[in-house]
C-alpha cells in the first residue's frame, strides 16, 4: 500500500507525537511512498542527519518502488534549551514524469531522545 509523501516524512522524523501533529496538515503530493520508502528515509535521517553538522546531506533510494531523494540538515537552533533542526527533503520517483518535490520540516528533540515536529 502506497502512502502519501507527507506521511512518509512524518515517519521519517517521527515517532508517534510527530505523526499525530502532521496528519492534520492535509498536504498533497504526486509521489506515493511505500512503507519501505518510509523505513529507509527514517533510518537515513536517524543515522546520517540528526545531530550532524549543518549542510550534511544524505541520499536514499528504493529500487523496488522507484522512489529516491535527498535529505539535508539546513539549520540547528534551540527552543527552551532543547536542540532543534530544520531538515530539507527532496523526493522524486522514476515511475512517472514529475518534478522532484521539496519539503522542509522543523523538529526538536524531546528529553527521551525522540524528535517532534515543531
Task: Give the role of each language-model region.
Residues 21-118:
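Extended interaction-bearing regions that mediate binding to partners or small molecules
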Residues 5-14:
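Sec-dependent N-terminal signal peptides
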Residues 14-15, 111:
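Generic short alpha-helical hydrophobic face used as a protein-protein interaction/packing hotspot
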Residues 1-2:
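N-terminal secretory signal peptides that target proteins for export/translocation
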Residues 16-20:
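Sec/Tat signal peptide C-region and signal peptidase I cleavage site
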Amino acid at each position: 500500500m502506497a502512502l502519501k509523501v507527507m506521511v512518509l516524512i512524518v515517519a521519517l522524523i517521527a515517532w508517534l507525537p510527530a505523526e499525530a501533529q502532521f496528519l492534520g496538515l492535509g498536504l498533497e503530493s504526486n509521489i506515493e511512498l511505500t512503507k519501505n520508502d518510509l523505513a529507509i528515509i527514517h533510518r537515513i535521517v536517524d543515522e546520517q542527519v540528526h545531530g550532524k553538522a549543518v549542510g550534511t546531506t544524505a541520499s536514499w533510494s528504493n529500487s523496488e518502488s522507484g522512489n529516491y531523494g535527498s535529505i539535508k540538515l539546513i539549520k540547528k537552533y534551540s527552543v527552551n534549551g532543547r536542540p532543534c533542526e530544520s531538515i530539507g527533503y527532496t523526493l522524486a520517483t522514476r515511475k512517472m514524469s514529475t518534478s522532484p518535490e521539496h519539503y522542509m520540516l522543523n523538529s526538536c528533540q524531546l528529553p527521551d531522545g525522540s524528535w517532534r515536529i515543531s
